[in-house]
């Protein structure tokens, strides 16, 4: 009888171990294909742009006033807390995100000057800096032009690539709204797997090709606040049906809203 019980326990332990290993394998496969794992990628690099570029972006007073209103309006702010443990497995970072997002639809509703700037003068500025003909992305997508707010201790987003759902190249521009140093920095890993940090202060903005740049926002310290304006641009707005579905799922997970 004791031998029988021992064998049943042993079989159960093997079953749990097999399930655990299967889950780990699935997570690694998902991470590899979704942008969670650091991998070697071939990318376009020239004198005009190579993975990222820093340049100053200045906002007019009427735009700053709109952003001040947005950042004070708690009703339109969506906090997303995605917590997984451990934070990394081997060379893959598990989905971890803590912070507030004000999505595009609220920017359109409450900040018309900002949207006009995003679609016109800012688009032209980024196009000149990168020497590319860029286009704004669809305003019905929640991350097209969004405000990112980190205000609680530990707010951050883990290492990841920005999956490119478009037929053309895909770029993200980050503009600092709070122009002072915090623990939350824009960080990326270079080809040598070294962590590099960029301080987004004093109007210093960064435009990067997130599909090829492995990056994160490091964790915020206590009694700090960081506000970033995130703007997305592409060389071709067309998107396949499958990628459109995948983008909807991603937006729902990270923003809590579905795009068009």
List PLM regions with ranges.
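Signature of the catalytic double-stranded beta-helix
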Residues: 91-144
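Catalytic core of Fe(II)/2-oxoglutarate
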Residues: 180-260
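Structured loops at beta-to-helix junctions and adjacent beta-edge loops in soluble globular domains
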Residues: 54-55, 148-151, 176, 209-211, ...
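Intrinsically disordered, low-complexity terminal segments enriched in Ser/Thr
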Residues: 3-5
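Short, charged/polar surface micro-motifs in flexible loops or helix N-caps
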Residues: 124, 150-155, 178-182, 213
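N-terminal auxiliary "cap/dimerization" subdomain that precedes the catalytic jelly-roll/cupin core
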Residues: 9-101, 116, 120, 255-260
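Conserved short histidine dyad/triad with adjacent acidic residue
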Residues: 148-164
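Short, conserved beta-strand element in jelly-roll/cupin
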Residues: 166-182
